Regions:
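Membrane-interfacial helix termini and adjacent extracytoplasmic/periplasmic loops
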Residues: 2-7, 42, 50-54, 86, ...
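Membrane-cytosol interface at the C-terminal ends of specific transmembrane alpha-helices
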Residues: 136-175, 200-201
Length: 261
């Protein structure tokens, strides 16, 4: 079979194809993005960058950063273990979280962690006389845990694609040079996997920023993120007041698109 090669197009045909390709970009991105810019500028000119929006931005940045780090670390360890053991069943099971809707995942965590909370609270109260209340539900820990379970598939998939570019001959050469598994992992694999890890981390960070169902159900009381604040404005019908939050999410989401293009 012969590989297909791109064919140059000129004249009217090229113009028509350009217009057809530009229409979805214009209607699906440029026009909405321009509207967000205009409305955000109006809100900043009128009321400035509010304290609530700043706090929501900091909450979003903190939660997404911690969740991204944990998810990448777990994914790296899982895929590396599969590399050495030649067994990928655990990585396949760990990737199932991405197929579960955020609402279903959040409800499942609420039920399981709620039962664990009550069991721990009862034990501490009867054995030590300490009343703790809920230790997991309604905390940032539960939300970060949900993010990690939800987006672990992105970490595993990205790192696996990086591992596919590392030939087994490199591992054999490292062993011949006296490296054990730990040395191969951190001195050989990790430096070669950095581009794949960074790409996966960017995608996970953006997904954590815009994850709404799990955040609404599991967030601590009085904690707002950019996604929940945007949802609150939309539910009140004040769409333009959520323009700044929406613009920030879009701008951060553009980073991996530009870098991965």
């Amino acid at each position: 079979s012969r590989l297909m090669s791109p064919q140059p197009i000129k004249g009217t045909r090229a113009l028509i194809l350009f217009v057809f390709g530009f229409i979805p970009v214009c209607t699906g991105f440029l026009i909405p993005f321009s509207h967000l810019l205009v409305e955000s500028y109006k809100r900043i000119q009128y009321a400035g960058f509010s304290e609530y929006l700043l706090q929501a931005s900091m909450n979003t940045l903190t939660l997404a950063s911690i969740a991204t780090f944990i998810t990448i670390l777990i994914g790296f360890l899982i895929v590396s273990a599969a590399r050495f053991s030649r067994n990928t069943w655990f990585s396949r099971i760990a990737s199932l979280g991405y197929a579960i809707p955020g609402t279903v995942l959040a409800i499942g965590l609420m039920l399981s962690l709620g039962a664990l909370d009550h069991a721990v609270a009862d034990f501490l109260e009867f054995k030590l006389g300490i009343s703790t209340g809920l230790l997991f539900l309604g905390t940032s820990f539960t939300l970060i845990y949900a993010y990690a379970v939800r987006f672990l598939a992105i970490s595993i998939g990205g790192i696996e694609s990086g591992y596919n570019r590392i030939h087994g001959v490199i591992d054999d050469a490292a062993r011949n040079l006296g490296q054990n598994r730990r040395g191969i992992l951190w001195r050989v694999h990790f430096p070669l996997l950095r581009p794949a890890i960074i790409s996966a981390a960017l995608l996970i960070f953006v997904d954590c920023m815009k994850e709404l169902p799990a955040t609404l159900l599991l967030r601590p009381l009085n904690m707002e993120t950019l996604a929940t604040q945007l949802y609150a404005e939309a539910s009140r019908g004040t769409y333009e007041d959520g323009a700044i939050a929406a613009l920030l999410i879009v701008l951060v989401g553009l980073i991996p698109v530009i870098l991965l293009a």
